Amino acid sequence: MQFLDDDPLIAKKDFGVQAALDAYFEELSGVLAALPREKIAAAVKICDETRRKNRTVYLCGNGGSAAAATHFAADLSKVAYVPGCARFRTCVLSDNTSTLTAYSNDESYDRAFRGQMEGLATRSDLLIGISTSGISASVVEAFAFA
């Protein structure tokens, strides 16, 4: 099997990888420096209060944001575990395709997450919505209920 870097024309070609990495890390450093640390700390406290009360963290998003919600839920329930403490209880509203498509088909996609919240969520549960635009109707509707 031949790999691309075995090709002498490709091996000699400078694709500007180092310059691209340098620019990426410089941009990333700026983004990290600009993060609102106080707001992040407040969000972590809210998540921890939800865990301590043995309440559920619901998450939702569309497209890549749905994948991010699933990944975050896995991190909360597995990685954020502290021995001797309760684990996070998580539910990703975009993961159950049967329920998601039933609400989408029978009502509207805009109500797909809200409909699930109406049947599942209780007082003191937490909803985390992920949206790159910030205006995804299905995510906004879930927050209107929460």
Task: Pin down the residues of each PLM region.
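A ubiquitous structural signal for well-ordered alpha-helices
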Residues: 24-27, 31, 43-46, 72, ...
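Short, structured helix-loop boundary elements
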Residues: 18, 37-40, 110
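Generic N-terminal amphipathic, Lys/Arg-enriched alpha-helix
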Residues: 1-34
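A short, well-structured juxtamembrane/interface segment
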Residues: 35-53
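Glycine-rich phosphate-binding loops that contact phosphosugars or nucleotide phosphates
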Residues: 58, 65-146
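Glycine-rich phosphate/diphosphate-binding loops and the adjacent beta-loop-alpha structural elements
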Residues: 9-14, 55-62
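N-terminal, charged amphipathic alpha-helical interaction modules
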Residues: 40, 64-65
